[in-house]
Amino acid sequence: MNHNKSYRKLGRRADHRKAMLKNMTISLIKAERIETTVTRAKELRKFAERMITFGKKNTLASRRNAFAFLRDEEVVAKIFNEIAPKYAERNGGYTRIIKTSVRKGDSAEMAIIELV
């Protein structure tokens, strides 16, 4: 049974999953648009939106929380200086998932996740 599961396992161990989602969050913030599978995009959305919300708070504690997860000062600076001010008036929903096609090798559903 799958009751009360608040995240997808993505077929990986916890440390691998966390590292993958961290790297995908960094890629999304840098490029503002990446292509991945639908389930990864849905899981990535949670982390990306949390980082942008930290940026909107713009406190020392929120900057440290963002850095504790991302471990990349350049990306944290981009969140706080460029991305968060764009979403000052928006309450959540900073990302958009657009389903595209299926991957040729394994027919996995692909999607583009981008910042709105």
Swiss-Prot record:
Biological process, per Gene Ontology: translation
Gene3D superfamilies associated with the record: Ribosomal protein L17
The entry's keywords: Ribonucleoprotein, Ribosomal protein
GO cellular component, one term: cytosolic large ribosomal subunit
GO MF, one annotated term: structural constituent of ribosome
Pfam families per record: Ribosomal_L17
PROSITE patterns xref list: RIBOSOMAL_L17 (PS01167)
Oligomeric and partner information: Part of the 50S ribosomal subunit. Contacts protein L32.
Family classification: Belongs to the bacterial ribosomal protein bL17 family.
Name of the protein: Large ribosomal subunit protein bL17
Species per Swiss-Prot/TrEMBL record: Fusobacterium nucleatum subsp. nucleatum (strain ATCC 25586 / DSM 15643 / BCRC 10681 / CIP 101130 / JCM 8532 / KCTC 2640 / LMG 13131 / VPI 4355)
Gene assigned in the entry: rplQ
